[in-house]
């Protein structure tokens, strides 16, 4: 993995033998040693911050529920309605309600994680090694979310169809079995690398531009990063719902 990206300051002259170099670190981690295992400490720290923020916001918004929602309660109900519509569209009217909590958790965690990476000045917090960033900036987080999605759509299909779920691998013809199996293995890969790649690329571009021109030039890209972060959360949740809906639909 790339460890360092060196950027020559634009104010240097080729005639000057001493070059000012800015550095953007990639792939460095703060490790916590637990027995024989190493954990990525900065990912756990930012994940706990995101989860804590979501839990506190939810408790504040819904601690005093009213028949006519106002303020934060109104906002949380709008988010819930949006997630219900997404689940209904992707999974279908018969099964969607039981999957609203799962898709809602996925969407909100990815959305808040992405925005935390785009909006919060994580780099102001110094660590012994590595630096804080969005949880979704780490491949371990995105792979975990993708594998959780894979387990969910296998569970949904087997729960509804039993072992008959695996008939889908030989439909419409038997010789498509390898391709159908490969498709199921490629789904978590595409989910995880799409999210990881977009978030990492956005943070790298902003980091490089801030190192080169630290004032106003990076602002438009930072705003674009906020927009794409929201889109990536929507894409991840939509595809998760689509995979679950595909696993429980009847094949004729």
Curated annotation (Swiss-Prot):
F-type ATPases have 2 components, CF(1) - the catalytic core - and CF(0) - the membrane proton channel. CF(1) has five subunits: alpha(3), beta(3), gamma(1), delta(1), epsilon(1). CF(0) has four main subunits: a, b, b' and c. GO terms for molecular function: proton-transporting ATP synthase activity, rotational mechanism. Key component of the proton channel; it plays a direct role in the translocation of protons across the membrane. It is a multi-pass membrane protein. One of its GO terms (cellular component) is chloroplast thylakoid membrane. This is ATP synthase subunit a, chloroplastic. It comes from Oedogonium cardiacum. The chain crosses the membrane at residues 41-61, 100-120, 138-158, 204-224, 225-245. PANTHER family: ATP SYNTHASE SUBUNIT A, CHLOROPLASTIC (PTHR42823:SF3). The keyword 4Fe-4S does not apply. It is found in: Plastid, Chloroplast thylakoid membrane. The lineage of its organism: Eukaryota, Viridiplantae, Chlorophyta, core chlorophytes, Chlorophyceae. Keywords: ATP synthesis, CF(0), Chloroplast, Hydrogen ion transport, Ion transport, Membrane, Plastid, Thylakoid, Transmembrane, Transmembrane helix, Transport. Belongs to the ATPase A chain family.
């Amino acid at each position: 993995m790339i460890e360092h990206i060196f950027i020559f300051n634009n104010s240097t002259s080729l005639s000057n033998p001493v070059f000012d170099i800015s550095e953007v670190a990639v792939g460095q981690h703060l490790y916590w040693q637990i027995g024989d295992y190493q954990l990525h400490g900065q990912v756990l720290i930012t994940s706990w911050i995101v989860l804590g923020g979501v839990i506190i916001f939810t408790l504040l918004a819904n601690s005093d529920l009213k028949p006519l929602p106002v303020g934060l309660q109104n906002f949380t109900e709008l988010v819930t309605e949006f997630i219900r519509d997404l689940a209904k569209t992707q999974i279908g009217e018969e099964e969607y309600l039981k999957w609203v909590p799962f898709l809602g958790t996925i969407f909100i965690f990815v959305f808040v994680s992405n925005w935390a990476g785009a909006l919060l000045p994580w780099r102001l917090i110094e660590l012994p090694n590595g630096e804080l960033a969005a949880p979704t900036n780490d491949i371990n987080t995105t792979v975990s979310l993708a594998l959780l999605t894979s387990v969910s759509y296998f569970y949904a299909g087997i729960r509804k169809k039993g072992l008959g779920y695996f008939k889908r691998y030989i439909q419409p013809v038997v010789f498509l079995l390898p391709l159908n199996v490969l498709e199921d293995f490629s789904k978590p890969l595409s989910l995880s690398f799409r999210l990881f790649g977009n978030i990492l690329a956005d943070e790298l571009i902003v980091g490089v531009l801030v190192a080169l021109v630290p004032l106003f030039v990076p602002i438009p890209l930072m705003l674009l990063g906020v927009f794409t972060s929201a889109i990536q959360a929507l894409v991840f949740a939509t595809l998760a719902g689509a995979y679950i809906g595909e696993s429980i639909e009847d094949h004729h």
